[in-house]
Amino acid sequence: SFSDSCASSQTQLAKVSVDREIARLAKIPQPEQRTQEWYLARYNLITASNAYKCLSTATNSEKNSIILEKCKPLVILDSTDSSTCLETSKNIEQSTYVNTESPLHYGVRYEPVSVLYYEWFYSTQIGEYGCIPHYKYSFLGASPDGINIKRDNNRYGRMLEIKNPKSRKITGIPKSEYWVQMQLQMETCNLNQCDFLETHFSEYDSYDEFLADGSFQMSDDGYYKGIIYHFKGNGKPHYEYMPFNATQSEYEAWDKQTMFKNQEKEWLETIFWKLDNVSCVLVERNKQWFKDNIVSMGEVWDTVLAERVTGYEHRKPKKRTNNDVSKQTTIKQYNEPLSPSKVKRTSLFSSY
């Protein structure tokens, strides 16, 4: 019909537009995520993850925090941890220590599993990108977790933002700073949609416990299962991920290949996981929001540039005096631990 023909033409035009943007992004030099070069590239940028601190609605404390972060010397903990930002490339301090038990590292460790799940569930392919500068505003940038690059998939051109909270409850509603982060990502890449994927993983104590819970691929309560190998190489953690939803025979073949490939590394542990909570919601680009906030972000960046020259000492936290400490009131907090049995599955998948 005529209406179907029009819809098909619009779809093709949309794909051509996505083709153009993905080709543009592919030409941008992109250092690997969380490498020293990646952190250096982020130095001269307000990135999507901290842009919420630059808005007109941000508190003075938040603005002070981002300005200080962008002025003080950088300490790179390692290629899988967070950092502050550097003053000059000569001021880099580097440490190989990695806290693999931190909530941050938990998210880093499981992000590839989340991507594998997303690709498998939606029959798509995710392209990975480094730190991408805004095409118009040179002080803005973003490091998306990925973009759908399978052209015959209805999610073609849709961005992907992943969060793996270790303890925070998954509600399906992005926190305001995450929403801002995705708006900056879409604005930087000039794409109009982003899937906000939240996943939570629990871990088995042993291979026997893993095998006893349902089938090799699925738990008794209907959750996907999988395996990660944790190695140490050059003093840093290295992970290998079993293909998503692999059978036991496929796992055994993967095991041999993986151990052979990593024979120069030290094997530390095998992690048996269960994906016990998933939420995926669509976030649309809001161009008017960006127009309303670009001035505020620019003003914060102008302050950063000025104080890199004039000094930023006044931004640092003030040391408390003995008199300040004596005025503090001790507050007791009572936290009731949640039973694992109370964990709910959030099912928000839709055919958008």
Question: For the regions a protein language model found, what residue spans apply to each?
Answer:
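Accessory terminal regions of nucleic-acid processing enzymes
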Residues: S1-Y352
